[in-house]
Amino acid sequence: MNILQINSSARSEGANSTRVANDVTTRLLAANPDATVTVRDLAKNPVPVLDEAALGALFAPVESRSTDQAARVAASDALIAEVQAADVLVLGVPMYNFTVTAQFKNWIDAIARAGVTFRYTANGPEGLLKGKTVYVALARGGQYRGSPLDTQVPYLKAVLGFLGITDVRFIYAEGLNMGPEAAAKGFAQAAADLDAALAA
């Protein structure tokens, strides 16, 4: 089993989403001791924004790409290869202003590429990253589970599903900024969610 852990907090140290993601990976390793783990920290190694230069590089013919364009595409190719090689993804996803972090969105923009991780067919789009399981470690300062303000879960289901990943399991750590008692309950709920996710 190949496990890919993506830490998407803007903080490389002390992030609650990373704490919960680490718990997921630790449990997966306990059940699969021969598994390999790759960890990508998007705070320490940020993915560039999908800007005009990036689009120019992606759409330029291979033989006419500049050195900078070739390097930009190669960096995106490496991120895609990590996902393609993974059997399981563990995503540490904090809530920033009711959505995912900019770091996470940049990663999604790098791995979602037509003809590589999805394709358009006569019957509509088809995801090409089938057969993977994703554990999403959600960390929130408040409590939003099941409410209209929880825009992360439908977004993640949509974008991962578009890429062919439909086995997506969510672990919620909420109320983490609402005082010590609420935070303790939030981490306890995350542990319970993880038990259920691993048993699914």
From Swiss-Prot:
The Enzyme Commission number assigned here is 1.6.5.-, 1.7.1.17
Give the family from UniProt. Belongs to the azoreductase type 1 family.
Summarize subunit and interaction data from the UniProt record for this chain: Homodimer.
**Pfam families listed in its UniProt record:** Flavodoxin_2 (PF02525)
Function of the molecule? Quinone reductase that provides resistance to thiol-specific stress caused by electrophilic quinones.
Q: What class of enzyme is it?
A: oxidoreductase
Protein name per its UniProtKB record? FMN-dependent NADH:quinone oxidoreductase
Which residues bind FMN per the record? 9, 95-98
MF GO annotations: electron transfer activity; FMN binding; oxidoreductase activity, acting on NAD(P)H as acceptor; oxidoreductase activity, acting on NAD(P)H, quinone or similar compound as acceptor
Q: Which organism is it from?
A: Azoarcus sp. (strain BH72)
Q: How is the cofactor bound?
A: Binds 1 FMN per subunit.
Q: Which UniProt keywords apply?
A: Flavoprotein, FMN, NAD, Oxidoreductase
**Cofactor(s) listed in the protein's UniProt record:** FMN
Q: Which reaction does it catalyse?
A: 2 a quinone + NADH + H(+) = 2 a 1,4-benzosemiquinone + NAD(+); N,N-dimethyl-1,4-phenylenediamine + anthranilate + 2 NAD(+) = 2-(4-dimethylaminophenyl)diazenylbenzoate + 2 NADH + 2 H(+)
Q: Which HAMAP family match?
A: Azoreductase_type1
Q: Which residues form the signal peptide?
A: none
